[in-house]
Amino acid sequence: MPGGPSPRSPAPLLRPLLLLLCALAPGAPGPAPGRATEGRAALDIVHPVRVDAGGSFLSYELWPRALRKRDVSVRRDAPAFYELQYRGRELRFNLTANQHLLAPGFVSETRRRGGLGRAHIRAHTPACHLLGEVQDPELEGGLAAISACDGLKGVFQLSNEDYFIEPLDSAPARPGHAQPHVVYKRQAPERLAQRGDSSAPSTCGVQVYPELESRRERWEQRQQWRRPRLRRLHQRSVSKEKWVETLVVADAKMVEYHGQPQVESYVLTIMNMVAGLFHDPSIGNPIHITIVRLVLLEDEEEDLKITHHADNTLKSFCKWQKSINMKGDAHPLHHDTAILLTRKDLCAAMNRPCETLGLSHVAGMCQPHRSCSINEDTGLPLAFTVAHELGHSFGIQHDGSGNDCEPVGKRPFIMSPQLLYDAAPLTWSRCSRQYITRFLDRGWGLCLDDPPAKDIIDFPSVPPGVLYDVSHQCRLQYGAYSAFCEDMDNVCHTLWCSVGTTCHSKLDAAVDGTRCGENKWCLSGECVPVGFRPEAVDGGWSGWSAWSICSRSCGMGVQSAERQCTQPTPKYKGRYCVGERKRFRLCNLQACPAGRPSFRHVQCSHFDAMLYKGQLHTWVPVVNDVNPCELHCRPANEYFAEKLRDAVVDGTPCYQVRASRDLCINGICKNVGCDFEIDSGAMEDRCGVCHGNGSTCHTVSGTFEEAEGLGYVDVGLIPAGAREIRIQEVAEAANFLALRSEDPEKYFLNGGWTIQWNGDYQVAGTTFTYARRGNWENLTSPGPTKEPVWIQLLFQESNPGVHYEYTIHREAGGHDEVPPPVFSWHYGPWTKCTVTCGRGVQRQNVYCLERQAGPVDEEHCDPLGRPDDQQRKCSEQPCPARWWAGEWQLCSSSCGPGGLSRRAVLCIRSVGLDEQSALEPPACEHLPRPPTETPCNRHVPCPATWAVGNWSQCSVTCGEGTQRRNVLCTNDTGVPCDEAQQPASEVTCSLPLCRWPLGTLGPEGSGSGSSSHELFNEADFIPHHLAPRPSPASSPKPGTMGNAIEEEAPELDLPGPVFVDDFYYDYNFINFHEDLSYGPSEEPDLDLAGTGDRTPPPHSHPAAPSTGSPVPATEPPAAKEEGVLGPWSPSPWPSQAGRSPPPPSEQTPGNPLINFLPEEDTPIGAPDLGLPSLSWPRVSTDGLQTPATPESQNDFPVGKDSQSQLPPPWRDRTNEVFKDDEEPKGRGAPHLPPRPSSTLPPLSPVGSTHSSPSPDVAELWTGGTVAWEPALEGGLGPVDSELWPTVGVASLLPPPIAPLPEMKVRDSSLEPGTPSFPTPGPGSWDLQTVAVWGTFLPTTLTGLGHMPEPALNPGPKGQPESLSPEVPLSSRLLSTPAWDSPANSHRVPETQPLAPSLAEAGPPADPLVVRNAGWQAGNWSECSTTCGLGAVWRPVRCSSGRDEDCAPAGRPQPARRCHLRPCATWHSGNWSKCSRSCGGGSSVRDVQCVDTRDLRPLRPFHCQPGPAKPPAHRPCGAQPCLSWYTSSWRECSEACGGGEQQRLVTCPEPGLCEEALRPNTTRPCNTHPCTQWVVGPWGQCSGPCGGGVQRRLVKCVNTQTGLPEEDSDQCGHEAWPESSRPCGTEDCEPVEPPRCERDRLSFGFCETLRLLGRCQLPTIRTQCCRSCSPPSHGAPSRGHQRVARR
């Protein structure tokens, strides 16, 4: 046989998965009673004797024979006392007959094949089955269940161990001697404890089915329906006595094994032990096991199939036992449960032997078809198997299966899934106690409430070990050949039996009473002497515990208090406590905050972190009305549910949706009254008053009678707390009732234009029943409502009326009081979405509401508290795809057959009010695509074309002339030509310049090659539009640099420097040099102002004002009036054909100092000197200030100063020189102060300075010379010269042939008598006066004068430093400054003498005139230049070698001009922006003839000898124009009433679209009024057949105000809905008129009407149908009828 674990090694525990039942101790066939016990060693043999209460010996006969036969009057509750010696200890048994073991009508019957063999009804059964306690003076005693019918046989507890006792088979009782008995400890089953085997196979039978308890719950409900008088459950857990009326069946193998009549005694002994286990206090309930019927099967029953297959055996037995059960609980033989004892080796789900010991239905007690169990006989431990299976019938599950009572260590319990190797007493665990208590409190054990009708027969009981010695116990367990194994272990701990050659144990101790020594036996696992049995101790209740913590923090939780039956604990067969065991009360009644999950949901969520079949789930509760107090949950998004707990936490509502307060308490649904007491039965009256009588109930009713309405209309308000609500239509109508909350957008019923089905709906905390029969609607609810509910009517047709009423609670005495009105602002419903697809807008208006009256005028509410109307976006279903077509572009041609207009066509979907999304074209394939091109302007004929002739010859042979040609309209199309497209008929032609003979002047004496009148009259000769070159951004904005300056006009922005024609400038300059050698009579005066006009001498203009008289400033400079640009601006170049400004890199800044800096050697950073803004006086070409005169109003403004003509070494000096006898040209010169010395000739006035806020310009006077010079750090000082021209002369001078005499210049600051002038302030242009009043050289010099030169570096206090007092002028003039770097511009240049002889020469001696000396002239040198301004030189010397000897007046000309043609070339400006960015345009640029030296403008004929003039026009923008891209129109800003749509307009490539064809970006939309047609429901057909008409109401309604429009034309933008339609078109079936039985009016009256001929009237014919109908031919007359009746 399979082995078991080694001794004292615990068997592994299995996690229970079974619900029906498990095995405890499998047995093996054992010997029959009376067999030999040889081979058994270490048996504790005891010799019990019967004693009295004091311990005195009474008899060796353990149960008196006389008592069995005669003394039937002996008290059944008389105790029996026994003593025995067990392991040297004296044990005393105090036993009492088990009065509840056998029912008064107990029947023991034997069944044979074919029927009942015999039945024995015992009216007075021997009371030899005893219950009580064993005591030891030192050891702790315990319960004892002993049968004393034939010796002592049973079980008892000692020292927390179980012991069996039974008589010793080998030593039968002898008269006068004590009968030997065997005592041994309870052991684990042999097959689980076979020596040397460590495995413990499972002994569980049937797997758990979670729906078993649900089935039981449903069965209980059906039983309650069948038995309505069943009392309801009580609020408290009450301990009540229960009697389990039991049928015990022993199968044929049992009877054969134990034999007759011992088998009956054996079975009763087992059941007596079972009854003792159910009397253990650990079970927590008083339960009596009572046998009403014992059936012994000698043969197999035909309908009872007992096999190894436990499941089939249980099924067969349950069916069989039900068939033999007596109907009616009052029958003496009716049993509550049935127990089968069999010697078959059971196996769950298989028909072969295995380890299963028993099987039972879980929670099957009191169910006739399920209250049954089967148990495998294993000897006396069979009692524990029976108790285990009965525990399953009471709904107890295995310890550790779904609970936390898994056995720990060696402490087993009765409901443990397996037995452990331990002899400790088996008791009920805490979980078993809770299971059986809940089973009974549920009312599932009602069949156990009836006790047996008669007294129970007393019969004696002795410990089983007295009746069955150890050898007998081995034979009972292992068969007839088994014997006790000696010296293996303490028999009171473990019973070891020999099976073949091996000792086996079932880990059970020998039963109590088993002999273990001299006068000792096993008791409760110890070998003790037989002791005295104490008095029975009934149990007593302890005090109530403190109330537990509330099971919930809100929402009505539960607290409990309990007491235990521990003061004292029942002992020695004492009675268990009866009465209230646990009480409950409610707590934390306040409602939980809104939004919290339900209490069941919280309990389900506790399992979210636990794996279920290897996965984590989010559990949500499942409603289970059958078992409302079980926790059933399902994973979210799954479709299966699982019972996660047998019972929910106390305080969980039984039902989630029902309006019930019932709570689950201790796994049972308890009723909660309105007073919040459990099972109080308190009820509310009809208005919700608990224990009320209805006196405070007030019924409110009303009728809504408005006949017409639009959409949802408020009917009335049901307040919170309303009950008995009834709402119904007065008559049938096609309208619909609706319910909404105070939130206008929250509807409970029929909201959102959606009609719901009939049924129950949760509304405001209660249930409304919605019923619609035909067109008649009503709503009912018991209430109460937890919030106000608005009744609304959805109009479809005229309203016949809506009646509503409800009941509300009002305090008594308050009926006559009118509550004050309460006004408040509320939001109305949201309007319909402004769009039917995509995203739109909804609005919610605010209205004033009175609590009772409903909506009222806004004047009643507080205007300051009025909330703003709300607006929100609304989203409808996506808009369908559609084609969008843009606007037609401008026609490609304004006339002719080729005109074509295009537009963009896109597939789009409207997303929102102002948003569209583009789709692929296939999305719009279901719609026809709009055309993208259309012909245009093809009906318009094009204008005629222009025809042109050939150009004529130029009108001049040189210079500029004109050319002409004929231009005619061809009239080829019949339409006049377009004047705007007419070609030019006259153009300007330019030929080479007209040249004058060299050395001669023009007709007017001008050296320019043309007359001054010609120059003056050519308005386009010098471009007036040229502006000064802008200064860099880092420089301050320059001041004005105009030529015409007026005093006291500092605000005027005067034009900057402009350019003059270098040709005239250069020629005049050369004439000036000719004046140096020719006398006044030889060379005429030249105009040095740079105007190009010859100015008459002062004496020839008598009208000119005196030079000494000031002229007031009366008007701005003439230059600005003539179109010359004013102050510099960032864009001073207007487009003009043939003209272009100098390139930006060549533009001259407006800062005056820049014009004086060297161009070639000056670094780029020169403009960053930070020069201040100032006004620069108009300076003529020769350096003179030239005020504007009437004659010079059209003078060309001066551009660059003449210093820029100098070579680099001399460009830092500007010398303006004029002779003393010359007058400055112009007018308006101010009166100058007189000379400081009276010996000097008077000064000539120079001109006026430009007035500024701080006059920073001083005036200089010299001996006949006035010079303007800016003096600034790094600037240039003035140079005074009378005889030597300093402008452009250095480039004309050849190296000197003869040394010049040395001349010295003394600084004026060191000379006495120098006048002082105001010192310029910081930041201004410093002008230094150099006056050489007494330092003029003798006039006999050759024309070299003194040129005092100021310092370039400022001295202290801002005054310029001076040079040394005496500096040779000639060496300074003919020397080259050494510029080492641009940084040296602030220092005085180091001069390098060109002629050392000149530097060394001293002052000249007095002149000694040599007679006959004459001038000698050398050969002319080559021209200094090939073009432009040049000169030739020749040496001139006096024949005597001393120039002083020759007359200066006769000196030949040493230099003269050459090559008068300027170096000219065409200069092209930048191309202008194309006139059209696409489609063919033109670009222009300015082409000018300029001097190649400094790009000064020249007249065009200067460039004609050179290359041809570059083109000034060119085509551009030839690429074709692209179409403008336009997005889809955005949603209209208004749904109606006129809005605006916008769209994006852009060019795919910037600049490649025709701007003139740019589409509009906005357009008006939704111009129709805000109205729509509103239709009502169709009315009833006017006729059910034969052609009828249905009509409906059609109105034009303003969607903004909701009011109908008087003028239906306002809805003209929508199609008129049909207001009628045909119906009932099927043909009517012919209907026979109803048969007239009798007249409705009296017979006499009808006869009178008939006689009067009124039967022709339909009403009369209907009322008197019998009288008015013609008599039938076959009908007897009334007279005949009367005769017949007679």
Curated annotation (Swiss-Prot):
GO terms for molecular function: metal ion binding; metalloendopeptidase activity; metallopeptidase activity. Binds 1 zinc ion per subunit. One of its GO terms (cellular component) is extracellular matrix. Induction: Up-regulated in articular cartilage and synovium from arthritis patients. Residues 462-537 form the Disintegrin domain. Residues 538-593, 821-880, 881-940, 942-995, 1411-1459, 1462-1522, 1523-1567, 1569-1629 form the TSP type-1 domain. Disulfide bonds join C318-C372, C347-C354, C366-C447, C405-C431, C474-C497, C485-C503, C492-C522, C516-C527, C550-C587, C554-C592, C565-C577. Zn(2+) binds at C204, H388, H392, H398. Pfam families: ADAMTS_CR_2, ADAMTS_CR_3, ADAMTS_spacer1, Pep_M12B_propep, Reprolysin, TSP1_ADAMTS, TSP_1. Residues 1210-1226 have a biased composition (Basic and acidic residues). Residues 1632-1672 form the PLAC domain. Residues 242-452 form the Peptidase M12B domain. The active site is at E389. N-glycosylated. Can be O-fucosylated by POFUT2 on a serine or a threonine residue found within the consensus sequence C1-X(2)-(S/T)-C2-G of the TSP type-1 repeat domains where C1 and C2 are the first and second cysteine residue of the repeat, respectively. Fucosylated repeats can then be further glycosylated by the addition of a beta-1,3-glucose residue by the glucosyltransferase, B3GALTL. Fucosylation mediates the efficient secretion of ADAMTS family members. Can also be C-glycosylated with one or two mannose molecules on tryptophan residues within the consensus sequence W-X-X-W of the TPRs. Metalloprotease. Was previously shown to degrade COMP. However, a later study found no activity against COMP. The spacer domain and the TSP type-1 domains are important for a tight interaction with the extracellular matrix. The conserved cysteine present in the cysteine-switch motif binds the catalytic zinc ion, thus inhibiting the enzyme. The dissociation of the cysteine from the zinc ion upon the activation-peptide release activates the enzyme. Interacts with COMP. This is A disintegrin and metalloproteinase with thrombospondin motifs 7. The lineage of its organism: Eukaryota, Metazoa, Chordata, Craniata, Vertebrata. The gene is ADAMTS7.
